């Protein structure tokens, strides 16, 4: 388990090396972690070709400012899997996204290095429950790959003080369940 740390980021190797080793990052409990400022409270990837599964994060905070509370990122070169990831009882300040999954993260490598082999990441079972934050641009943003959509996402009991751009965006995702998402939309000043 991981506890009382400041930056929980889970990785599981990149491309051929990770596929050859076949050693997933798995069975991890993350609790009582506080991140003051940074990119993400719980980050998975993009180096996750060996797979990440069975992660339970609970009772953590991001009181100031982060880009995302929970961010899973991969691309069509990575392969591997992301499955059975839980985030529960989290309190946060302001951010861009409460939950984001992006399956097309290549940054500068998109044009610098050619794709020799497509290997789509299997993403199944992402669960978020009892999350409170002050302000976000969006509650959740799920961008799956059409060839292997994201499956089984549950977002429950999320309270946001203010949403400034949009509540949700879902592309290539199946069985997305939301329950009891409470938010206030940004009011334009007259």
Please give the residue ranges for each predicted region:
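Short, small-residue-biased leader/transition segments that mark boundaries at the very start
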Residues: 1-7
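Leucine-rich repeat
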Residues: 9-14, 19, 36, 40-45, 121, 138-147, 165, 170, ...
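Surface-exposed loop/turn motifs in large extracellular/passenger domains
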Residues: 15-33, 48-62, 75-91, 108-132, ...
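Catalytic cores of secreted or luminal carbohydrate-active enzymes
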Residues: 90, 94-99
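Structural detector of coil-to-beta-strand junctions
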Residues: 9, 41-43, 69-71, 98-100, ...
């Amino acid at each position: 388990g991981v506890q009382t740390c400041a930056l929980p980021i889970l990785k599981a190797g990149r491309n051929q090396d990770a596929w050859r080793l076949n050693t997933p990052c798995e069975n991890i409990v993350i609790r009582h972690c506080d991140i003051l400022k940074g990119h993400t409270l719980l980050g998975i990837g993009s180096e996750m070709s060996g797979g990440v599964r069975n992660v339970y994060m609970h009772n953590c905070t991001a009181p100031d400012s982060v880009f995302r509370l929970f961010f899973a990122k991969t691309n069509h070169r990575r392969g591997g899997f992301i499955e059975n990831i839980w985030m529960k009882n989290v309190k946060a300040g302001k951010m861009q996204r409460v939950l984001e999954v992006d399956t097309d993260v290549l940054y500068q490598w998109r044009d610098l290095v050619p794709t020799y082999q497509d290997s789509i990441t299997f993403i199944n079972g992402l669960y978020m429950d009892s999350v409170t934050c002050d302000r976000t641009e969006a509650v959740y943003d799920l961008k799956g790959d059409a060839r292997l959509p994201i499956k089984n996402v549950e977002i429950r009991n999320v309270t946001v003080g203010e949403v400034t751009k949009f509540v949700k965006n879902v592309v290539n995702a199946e069985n997305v369940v939301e329950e009891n998402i409470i938010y206030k939309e940004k009011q334009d000043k007259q």
